Amino acid sequence: MKQLNRLPNAGRTNPDQNINFTFNGKAYQGVMGDTLASALLANGVNVVGRSFKYSRPRGIVGHGAEEPNGIIQLGSGAATVPNLKVTQVELYEGLEASSVNGWPNVNFDLMGIMGWFGRLMPPGFYYKTFMYPQKLWMTYEHFIRKAAGLGKTPVEADPDVYDKLNQHCDVLVVGAGPAGLVAAREAAEAGARVIIADEQSEFGGSLLASAQTLSSVSASQWVADMVEQLNRYSNVQQLPRSTVFGYYDHNFLTILEKRTDHLGLSAGKGQQVRQR
């Protein structure tokens, strides 16, 4: 399969290892190291979703958690996961994904006709328009829910295995960009127990896409050297693919670590811990 928009010798991918996947029922091919977003863009897929309310076509504009448009349903059956962002889904063999809205499909959405009546639908109009007769609200809600463009939760029992772990540290570094890596190293050298967490699959942050030099070496080499230094410290715990999402009383923080999400079917359902 041709990936017409694939840049040669660019990015942090391995072009020698192809990965097959499907999006909205159509087969595509990406390479090792792709996210679903980069694989779709390489294949010329520009429309990945539809806007709320007016169902206008939307494409990928971000490269991480900030992506507002590329919301997808991943997998099927009991293992399906709703409302993931294409920029945060690592590509794996056999991946199946679909847009969460757009009927009959994301490229031709009949709900797009709503844009013609925009002047008649100010923000919050549905809270007034669909109040009466009250007994029909459940009928109204059914169609409003479909127009909202949200994913579907599975009704079967979750086949995956999850874990929880309590860890203690003196310093928690959130984000493994250049500042985070230096902070973790300095704290480790001082003898502190350090946990450094980053939501990406690799440490480096903005330097992963940088062509600048630091300390007379390339940005990517500088990151590799810093990670190697951290590996030497027994008092440092590195957590890639980990999102720090809560800061509570008594310096209690919560982290979600994705352990096997990037492996897909090869991880074996129910055989390994998926997240903790």
Q: What are these model-predicted stretches?
A:
Residues M1-L150, D158:
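Signature of N-terminal electron-transfer/Fe-S-associated modules in redox systems
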Residues N24, N43, G75-S76, Q134, ...:
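Fold-independent oxyanion-binding glycine-rich loops
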Residues E67, Q212-S216, E257:
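Short, hinge-like loop/turn segments at secondary-structure boundaries
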